[in-house]
Amino acid sequence: SKINNRRSNNSISKRRNMKQKLEEYFDRLWPINRSLTGNGVRKSLEILSEIVEFNITEVPSGTVCFDWTVPPEWNIVEGWVKDSSGKTIIDFKEHNLHILGYSEPVKGKFTYDELQPHLYTLPEQPELIPYLTSYYKRRWGFCMSHIEFEKLDKAETYEVFIDSTLDDNGSMTIAEATIKGTTDETILLSTYICHPSMANNELSGPLVASFIYNQLKTIPNLRYTYKFIFVPETIGSIYYLSKNGENLKENLTAGFVITCIGDPGVFTYKKSRRGDALPDRAAEIILSQTESNFNIIDFFPSGSDERQFCSPGFNLPVGSLIRTMYGKYPEYHTSADNKDFISFEAME
């Protein structure tokens, strides 16, 4: 009885420890401005490399992967809008969603009518800041709550400043980690690292993947070889497939894209395009044994990086593990996808 109690206490203490570590890493990663490329991704991977032994690759901007091209590297120092009295109306330093991702630099004075086409809001969620990007079309812009937008004075002239760079000689950063098994049969865990301060839609995936890596590292004589990739969504997995796709076709037994895994909703598993591959069967069995309530949905071609892995040229056995599906919760791609929305118990 004493031994059982000790085991139970150890288990509680380990869980508390895991939850605490998840939260500590979350707090460090949260303020960093990540995008498809740039120093925010490097800084985030540097922090996560305390948990995961990464092999990091810098892919030069302009690299062609299939019919896609790696974009210029984007970095930003500051961005703001002030009125004629010098009062700051929008400030990137207050919330990094305030900037349209990949905004080109700008400095100048604009009337309300000139500025208005560069402002983005969510009239149906008026208190929230939207998350928007323009990776492949040069433009600049700011995102703000519709409430603040409605307060703008139409007779004002506004001073606008964005200190950003788009570097054709820059690079895109991707990270890979491998835990070698006794066979070359491979299980892939893929997550993306490319969004600014959003909790569920950005940080839940890399955090959960990092701690899965950490747990697997402690298990001796694993049969499968585990590959973990942390890549900018879409372009990162397309680049990865351009380099490793043939090898994956040969050795990949199962793969999972981990995304939106931090909210308190029930598990959702999105099947691979094959529909009856090993990960599809395994997910169904495990969820039915461990969860009283869950969703299993068929593959559809939009979504996250499963669309690249399951694309016709590869058709790999890769499904997606999610809690509440992207686009199905109102906080998605807004400033409400924050620490209050997620649950560290759910991530554990």
Predicted regions and their residues:
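N-terminal hydrophobic/helix-forming segments and targeting peptides
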Residues: K14-E348
